[in-house]
């Protein structure tokens, strides 16, 4: 532990909190256009083909965002809405595409947690 004199000579440094979703610029959602839609493989213990899209946002940022749910209709030039939220086993994927908004359709035949996947109530 430093002495009072040491603290006077060199004060304590405040820890700088880094922004986890810089492209959002303090907005809850952002609109963008898909520039590339592809699959990628997750980190070590997991194995799958995760669906992701490269999105050019309205503020000029280009980010990689995850497409949640089973099946999607996205292709190049699709207009999408993204939100923050990383995918733990995909390095560099820090955003999610919102299903059921703009050009993104909701997940078909979804019965539980429908609001998260933009699915209408089944009849």
Swiss-Prot record:
The modification 3-methylthioaspartic acid is found at residue 89. Pfam families: Ribosom_S12_S23. One of its GO terms (cellular component) is small ribosomal subunit. The keyword Cell inner membrane does not apply. GO terms for biological process: translation. PROSITE patterns: RIBOSOMAL_S12. GO terms for molecular function: rRNA binding; structural constituent of ribosome; tRNA binding. Residues 104-123 are annotated as: Disordered. Residues 110-123 have a biased composition (Basic residues). Belongs to the universal ribosomal protein uS12 family. Part of the 30S ribosomal subunit. Contacts proteins S8 and S17. May interact with IF1 in the 30S initiation complex. With S4 and S5 plays an important role in translational accuracy. This is Small ribosomal subunit protein uS12. It comes from Rhodospirillum rubrum (strain ATCC 11170 / ATH 1.1.1 / DSM 467 / LMG 4362 / NCIMB 8255 / S1). The gene is rpsL.
């Amino acid at each position: 532990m430093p002495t009072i004199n040491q603290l006077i000579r060199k004060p304590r440094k405040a820890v700088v909190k880094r922004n986890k979703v810089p492209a959002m610029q303090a907005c809850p959602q952002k609109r963008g256009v898909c520039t590339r839609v592809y699959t990628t493989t997750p980190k070590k213990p997991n194995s799958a083909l995760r669906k992701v899209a490269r999105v050019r946002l309205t503020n000029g940022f280009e980010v990689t965002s995850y497409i949640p749910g089973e099946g999607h209709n996205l292709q190049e030039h699709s207009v999408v809405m993204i939100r923050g939220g990383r995918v733990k086993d995909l390095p560099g994927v820090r955003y999610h595409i919102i299903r059921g908004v703009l050009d993104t359709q909701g997940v078909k035949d979804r019965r539980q947690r429908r609001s998260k996947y933009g699915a209408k109530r089944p009849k």
